[in-house]
UniProtKB/Swiss-Prot annotation:
SUPFAM superfamilies: Ribosomal protein S18. This is Small ribosomal subunit protein bS18c. It is found in: Plastid, Chloroplast. GO terms for cellular component: chloroplast; mitochondrial small ribosomal subunit. One of its GO terms (biological process) is translation. The gene is rps18. Residues 85-95 have a biased composition (Basic residues).
């Protein structure tokens, strides 16, 4: 390649390939809560395959495992923070006096 064309070539940037989220030794099972909880959002939703960087088969197995764990109440359907906020909303408050000071009637 001559010198005039070399000016337009971009240098390739190096990048570090991310490690796969599931190693070969990990078992995708409803009892493996530490593994399953990595694929659930803070709202308690199952994260998409694109976000998780999983294969189709792995995503299917993770989804089934999460659903089984929820049914067997190993995982909550909703995270605890939301339940706490809801309970706080309906909490009864103390009644306050409507009058500011003592008022007397003028006769």
């Amino acid at each position: 390649m001559d010198k005039s064309k070399r000016l337009f070539l971009k240098s390739k940037r190096s990048f570090r390939r991310r490690l796969p989220p599931i190693q070969s030794g990990d078992r995708i099972d409803y009892r493996n809560i530490s593994l399953i909880s990595r694929f659930i959002s803070q709202q308690g939703k199952i994260l998409s395959r694109r976000v998780n960087r999983l294969t189709l088969k792995q995503q299917r197995l993770i989804t089934i495992a999460i659903k089984q764990a929820r049914i067997l109440s190993l995982l909550p359907f909703r995270p605890k923070a939301q339940r706490f906020k809801k309970a706080q909303r309906f909490k009864r408050r103390q009644s306050t006096a409507r009058t500011v000071g003592l008022r007397t009637r003028n006769k």
